[in-house]
Amino acid sequence: MEFSPLLQRATLIQRYKRFLADVITPDGRELTLHCPNTGAMTGCATRGDTVWYSTSDNTKRKYPHTWELTQSQSGAFICVNTLWANRLTKEAILNESISELSGYSSLKSEVKYGAERSRIDFMLQADSRPDCYIEVKSVTLAENEQGYFPDAVTERGQKHLRELMNVAAEGQRAVIFFAVLHSAITRFSPARHIDEKYAQLLSEAQQRGVEILAYKAEISAEGMALKKSLPVTL
């Protein structure tokens, strides 16, 4: 998926109030960007990092610029806009770039399901096959090439795992899909040191038939695409 129009570059001053970030452009202008990420953004928002941002043509927006990517001082590209995880996953499924999720004739988004009144990110369907329920998570936390999720305690994420276990118990296919949006990550594990309950539930989910997939995106200032399956260690 290509960025159109192309992203613009700036240098990060600070992220604050969760949804805002101040940057300096190459010509010395100071801008305030919308930050579309409610997470901790550990390692993704260091002062001096390069920020790549888009600009909306919607004149009613208070903050027309949106922070899309970080290019860390070590050179790693990180997608901080969490909306891209679902966009890239949908594109990869439709292009059949994810072999484990190929061969379906129908893709639906935001389908209501489950006892806890959730919405599944994607449901795949095909004749003579069980429905496939897919929950997508964005992975940007990295330590020594190891990717982790979550970057903060997530009761919502725990709920999604419980719902997927129920789906698998009903004979349908249940998949938790980790979209790795950090170019330095080479392998994935749950962040037990941050949310032990989530890590425990992920192991339980696998034992109960929930499939765990992790795919890494190729990221540049020109575009992104999910390309490579990564090893998962629980």
UniProtKB/Swiss-Prot annotation:
<protein>
    <recommendedName>
        <fullName>Sugar fermentation stimulation protein A</fullName>
    </recommendedName>
</protein>
<dbReference type="InterPro" id="IPR005224">
    <property type="entry name" value="SfsA"/>
</dbReference>
<feature type="DNA-binding region" description="H-T-H motif">
    <location>
        <begin position="201"/>
        <end position="220"/>
    </location>
</feature>
<dbReference type="Pfam" id="PF17746">
    <property type="entry name" value="SfsA_N"/>
</dbReference>
<comment type="function">
    <text>Binds to DNA non-specifically. Could be a regulatory factor involved in maltose metabolism.</text>
</comment>
<keyword id="KW-0238">DNA-binding</keyword>
<dbReference type="InterPro" id="IPR040452">
    <property type="entry name" value="SfsA_C"/>
</dbReference>
<dbReference type="Pfam" id="PF03749">
    <property type="entry name" value="SfsA"/>
</dbReference>
<dbReference type="GO" id="GO:0003677">
    <property type="term" value="F:DNA binding"/>
</dbReference>
<dbReference type="InterPro" id="IPR041465">
    <property type="entry name" value="SfsA_N"/>
</dbReference>
<comment type="similarity">
    <text>Belongs to the SfsA family.</text>
</comment>
